[in-house]
Structure formats: structure tokens, C-alpha cells
Amino acid sequence: MRIKEISLRQDPDLRKELALLARGCDFVLPSRFKKRLKAFQQVQVQTKKEETLPPSLSQTIPTFYFPRGCPKEKVNIDAVIAKIERTFSQFPNERATLDDMGKVAKACDCPLYWKGPLFYCAGGERTGYVSVHKFVAMWRKILQTCYDDAAKFVHLLMNPGCNYLVQEDFIPFLQDVVNSHPGLSFLKEASEFHSRYITTVIQRIFYTVNRSWSGKITLTELRKSNFLQNVALLEEEADINQLTEYFSYEHFYVIYCKFWELDTDHDLYIDRKDLARHNDHAISSRMIERIFSGAVTRGRKAQKDGKISYADFVWFLISEEDKKTPTSIEYWFRCMDLDGDGALSMYELEYFYEEQCQKLDNMAIEPLPFEDCLCQMLDLVKPQYEGKITLHDLKRCKLTNVFFDTFFNIEKYLDHEQKDQFSILRDSEGESPEVSDWERYAAEEYDILVAEEAASFHFVLGSTEVQLPKSWICNLSFSLHEKISKISTNLNWFRLWIFCLEKK
């Protein structure tokens, strides 16, 4: 109950007490006045606060944060739904199978290869089909809550209750790409390679898109990446190898063959000794130890057993062959930052350079003293703070490959030393190349692998020697001994045998 704002002096009892106080008597405030005085003071304070508050501005500030995309006023949801219903009317009982979802995706104004996520999000995996009513209910909800492609794609793939994507969320989507893309048609008879190709693509997606290293792709990360643009290109580009950032089969082949050479027991795990054999022991043992320390790998089981998985190897190989990308710089920085303080000290640089000096001594090459090497690297990086190199310093540097190779890759270090320094500087100061270091490496290695296999597969039928066309080798790009073990069962090999007979 609000107390009226009146002076307490008007109270007759209080006036009597005040008169006694004026004559020199002690002032005794009756207990009944204490509550009234307290209520009076509270009203006065509340009135003062209300007077000092500025007028509310909430009505004048428009909404500026749209986590699911900015709403589009001109979108007519009913028209979109009507278009979808007309598409479903073409199917028996107005039910769409996975093969029909390409038309449905187009009716939704989505790229063709969203068809798998659309099908699975509407519950098609359980029944083998999607009814028009269930799909319309699902898509209407998405249109009402998701206002851009990134928000829609995440909603289609994510688990209920999540607002991010983990690696497992991409498997159904990529399996549909493997099953239906014309550039991967030769994989239909080699189902055992589906999971390995999918694993490779997933790791490349997270390598490029998941900039936070959290293992969870957020809406913001997806919007900042070019992944959805590459998904749209799947429809336009029949040659999967032209999509070099994520989906290239040739890149998968190079990565898998490099791993297969190291994985002697073929359990899809390698230990320290296996990884040390990469590129003829070019990587220092101290760096190998750091890779297995868990600084750049995930999974407690692998770390406990002292092994890394094929998925971890994908990150390693891409980082090793292209040390200029943000993720690769972060990868090697984590490895070299021994104490995890966010900076590379001179002691940490010396720790890795010591082994490089030992290798150079074994090769009868006089190593550069560490002090001189350090001066060169500081001139190269130009750190902001004296005595330490931060991640920001390395990302500003255009020759991070030279910096990292100096401390843990002896072969590439010697290559840099033999190069003309002016040409190195000229390359670093030029515009960003159209072909990255990784793409250049993958193309060269693929040509080498194809040439080696082409030389190995010469068939002699009578007096006629038949050499496999390159296209056959491309389509049958599996490991050599795996091919031999599948000659009797692989349909492609049967076709090849017919081809050889025709040549004869």
C-alpha cells in the first residue's frame, strides 16, 4: 500500500514530541512511528529514483542480432509450400523416396545435394519414404525459424536440441554424395572405401571450417566459410576432382596412399615409428613426440595407446604440405609451444633446432649456429614483442613455411637454403596464388602414383602388350595389393579383362 507524500510534522503526536525536544527534553520516538517513518523514507527514495531514470530507448533501437539469419519480408511461405505439394503430387501416394528428393530439393529452392539431409530430417530413413504432410510440416517450421542457407543446413543435419554440427552429422549427407554423384560412380563396387573417403572429406571440412578447434561447427563458422558454395558446385561440376577444397577424390587417394605406406598392419592407426618414416624421416623426432602428445589430436583412446588415427593423419599431412594456411599455422604453433603459454620462447626454438643441427652433422653439413639462425628467423617474422613469437606474429608473416621447416623438417629446410632468397621473397610479396601449396603437392603426388601404377599394370596377351589407360587407373585408385586381392570380385576388373581381349 502506497503512503501519501505528506509531512510527518502534521502528525499531532509527533508535533508534541518535537515541542518537548525544543524545550530540552529527550526525544523518544514511539514505536508506532518507526514503521511509518520507514515507509515514508522508502516512498521518498522510490520517487527520487523514478525521477532520475532516463526515458526508455528500447522502442527506438531496431533488432540487430539474428542468430538464424535476417528474416526476409518478401518470402511467401504459402507459395513455397504449394510448389512443394505440386512436386509431391507427381509421386505415387504423394510419397517421395531418396531418389525423388532431387526434385523436392529444387522445389525448396535448395542445391541438389541437399536432398539427402532433407530426406533424413523428415524421417525418411526409418520408413524409406517421406510423405507430403510430414515434409511440409518440417519445411514450414524451418522457413519460419531459419532465414539463411547456413541456418537451414545446420538445422537439417544437427541432432535435436543442438545448434552446431559434429563430425557424425555429416555422414548421411556425404554417403548420399558418394552414392549419387557421377564423379564417384566407380566407387559403387568398392563400398569398403566409402567410409575412408567420407572420413577424409569430414576431416577436410573441419580442418577448414571449424576455426575454433572445438570439434563443433557453429552457424557463424559455417557462414564465414565457403563450404555451402562448394556443396552447390557438386551439382554443376561432374568431375569431382575439380572441387579441390573438400571433395576431390584425387586428394583422398594421395592422402590414403601416404597413410597406407606407413600403416604396416593396416589397422588404420599408426604409432611414432610409423609416422617417423614419412618422407624418409624428414620430420624430427621431437616434433613427432609433440604430435603424439595430444596437442593437435583428439581422442583419449588413441593417445593412451600411443597411436594416431587416419583422421589425425589427414590433418598432419595437409598441415605438413601447406604451412601457410591459418589452420596449419595453428597446428604447428601448438606443437612448438611446449609450455602452452601462447608464445614461442627462444628456449623452445632452441629445443627443436638442436635436433636439426644433429641431423646436419650426420650429413656432414656444418649447421648454422643457433644465434645466427635465431636472428634470421626474427628478421623473417618481425615479432611484435621482444623475446617471443606469438601466433599473431606468424599469421602476419608470409613465409611461415620457411620458419617452421627450419625447426623440424630437414629436407625442406635444405631446399629453402638452396633456393634463391630473392625468389622466395618475390613469391611471398606477390598476390595469393590461385593454386595452394597443398593443391600443388596433391597434383604432383597423384601423377607420380598414377605413373607408378600404370607401369606396374602391363598385361601381355599372347604377343600383344596392353597398357592400362590413365582413366582406368584413376577410377581404380586403390592400393596395389588390395587391387590384386579383388581381381575376381571387382566388376571393374572384369570390364578391364574384356577391354584387354578386345585389344588383342
Stretches with model-predicted labels:
Residues 1-504:
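Acidic, Asp/Glu-rich intrinsically disordered regulatory regions of eukaryotic Ca2+-responsive proteins
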